[in-house]
């Protein structure tokens, strides 16, 4: 198990499982929803089982049509910001559309649909990927070029957001060499056997926020106003750093509705598994049958072993069991009791 090990795998697994159980009905009066998509594939293609983030173009258009027929109002980032400043009010059933990673499919498949339905949307760019540099989490899919980015931005329909420059990856976060989300992890220096200090961490986060914003301005002439956190991971320090760099709105990946009072951490509902219009309607209306929380208690002592390789095997085994048992909530016993006496 290489990238993100227990932390990343548990977070990702529980996120996708809990996504299935959420009820998303909401009222208006300053509330809004946000949907999150990634890559969009051709109508004749079948979403591969290993890529849960792909959505078929005809399903996407079906979802756009459903939103219009059911009274949802797709709004822009500017409309949300104006409402937050008291310059206007949000319409009933306001909703943001967001697309992560800057894939070419946004230009070739999504953008024509936005123009057809007059829907605004936000697209989040990963600077290092746009720069042509390969990273551990680079999906290897075609991306938009800068001319296309400028074109969609100039249309008036698309908000260009930062998805960081180089934080869409993992960094070493412990002596075992496990990598974790760069935004929220204190870097572990293996040769020196130390973690970065709070001051070093803050400096790294701040530098990344400014670099990502400056990179987009350099190539597109746009100062991004929105930071979209890779993997949905953020904290108060990263939010403050993004704000310093001019990105007053940031977005994560937690289900639920939003209020104008909390634009520093906008909740977004990720659309996975190419749900089809029936499941999409259930997601949007919250009419699904209430499902129980399935809980597991995990004792960290049973994961740890003096042999690092055995620890890795233990982690892999428990993550697989959590998936197989459809567990959506895990309580960690995050303290050591090696002699088993309860103290």
Q: Which residues are covered by each model-predicted region?
A:
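Catalytic domains of carbohydrate-active enzymes, especially glycoside hydrolases
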Residues: 55-75, 121, 313-338
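Alpha-helical scaffolding within the catalytic cores
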Residues: 80-83, 106-110, 137-153, 172-174, ...
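Metal-dependent polysaccharide deacetylase catalytic core of the NodB/CE4 family, i.e.
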Residues: 30, 35, 40-41, 93-95, ...
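N-terminal pre-catalytic segment of deacetylase/amide-hydrolase enzymes
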Residues: 3, 25-95, 261-264, 268-288
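Aromatic-lined substrate-binding rim segments of carbohydrate-active enzymes
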Residues: 89-92, 100, 105-115, 318-319, ...
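Bacterial N-terminal signal peptides that target proteins for export
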Residues: 2-13
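Conserved beta-strand positions in the central sheet of alpha/beta enzyme cores
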Residues: 34-36, 76, 161, 228, ...
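Bacterial N-terminal signal peptides
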Residues: 11-22
